[in-house]
C-alpha cells in the first residue's frame, strides 16, 4: 500500500498482490 503517483509507473515491478491492493 506504498504505491504513490510517482511509483505508479514502477508499481508493475512490485508484487501484483500489493500493486492490486493499492490500485483497488
UniProtKB/Swiss-Prot annotation:
Record carries keyword Disulfide bond: yes
Protein family membership: Belongs to the thaumatin family.
Cysteine-cysteine disulfides: none
Official protein name in the record: 33.0 kDa cold shock protein
Induction cue: By cold shock.
Keyword Coiled coil annotated: no
High-level lineage: Eukaryota, Viridiplantae, Streptophyta, Embryophyta, Tracheophyta
Record keywords: Apoplast, Disulfide bond, Glycoprotein, Secreted, Stress response
Amino acid at each position: 500500500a506504498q504505491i504513490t503517483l510517482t511509483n505508479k509507473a514502477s508499481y508493475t515491478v512490485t508484487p501484483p498482490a500489493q500493486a492490486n491492493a493499492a490500485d483497488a
